[in-house]
Amino acid sequence: MKIRNACAVLIEVLLFILEGVTGARKISTFSGPGSWPCNPKCDGRTYNPSEECCVHDTILPFKRINLCGPSCTYRPCFELCCPESYSPKKKFIVKLKVHGERSHCSSSPISRNCKSNKIFHGEDIEDNQLSLRKKSGDQP
């Protein structure tokens, strides 16, 4: 029994050395823009899923910030901007997108209510060069 185990170990070591010398095993790397194993596409264009997303046939960076109503922001790669009411005073809710599923306002979990929480991510707004309106009482 010990001889069989020793032979198996010896064979494995020899195969390992042989692979290193001859380069028999090729390891593929995914460093180029068109070399992703599944080549995710958005409207026919390939994109990098570790840095970008596809929303309505448009490639967006993960840092992208959009307005949800007049006073709230959301990240379209990770969240949905959903109308809560269609009255003249429209109310909006930000909902989370569920990874791996097609997200809809009717079935996604609520992240926050835009009317009660005015959340602005300063660094994200600066990255996207969004401008904020000054309060009406502020002087220039």
Curated annotation (Swiss-Prot):
Its main location: secreted. InterPro entries: IGFL (IPR032744). Induction: Up-regulated by Imiquimod. Up-regulated in skin upon tissue inflammation and injury. It comes from the Eukaryota. Residues 1-24 form the signal peptide. PANTHER family: INSULIN GROWTH FACTOR-LIKE FAMILY MEMBER 3, INSULIN GROWTH FACTOR-LIKE FAMILY MEMBER 3-RELATED. Belongs to the IGFL family. This is Insulin growth factor-like family member. The lineage of its organism: Eukaryota, Metazoa, Chordata, Craniata, Vertebrata.
